[in-house]
Amino acid sequence: MSKKKPLIVFEGIEGSGKTTLINYISKFFLRKKIKFIKIREPGGNKNSETIRKLILNNKNNFNSFTDLMLYFAARSENIDLTIKKNYNKSIILLDRFTDSTIAYQHYGMGLDKNLINKINKSLLKDIKPDLIFINVVNSKNLVKRLRLRKLRNRYDNFNTKFYEKVQRGYLKLAKNRSKYVIIDSNKKLIENKKEVLNKIKKIIYV
């Protein structure tokens, strides 16, 4: 069997378990000696990580449009310096990508969806995700998980209604689209790990 080099995205609101799953898949790839790169957004290289610190710093209070532009700046650096070099050459695991911008900045904050899509299209050009996991969590578990987080950033401080709007946005993006897989983070973690791993195996071995 030959190995495909897909771009795989893990999406979801804070506390939904996406980072736990991406770390699990990373460890699996390391054990199997499968070449991959793991990137987070905002982040992925020195320039994008610098912008990330600005966005998430609790001391900052940017308006929603400034936030949007900072996310795009970080993504531009990430694509130019990291993703382009690895696209189709290595499996790419992304902790957040373009759907996060639409879910948070459009569905959550009310910014223009057409503008967001236009800039994303300009940045991505021919880069396309092959598989997108969207982790969903109910309000009760969300509140519980956020309370347990040791390192809180500015986006951990929004109210539950905001996160519910964002999550509904994610589900709208995923509706009737084959690249998307909804992961119910209210289920046992071991079940979700198995589901994610099985889906990934199906696309990396063709």
Model-derived features with residue positions:
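Conserved lysine of the Walker
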Residues: 18
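A glycine- and Lys/Arg-enriched "phosphate-lid" helix/loop adjacent to the NTP-binding pocket
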Residues: 101-168
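Hydrophobic anchor at the beta1->P-loop junction of P-loop NTPases
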Residues: 10
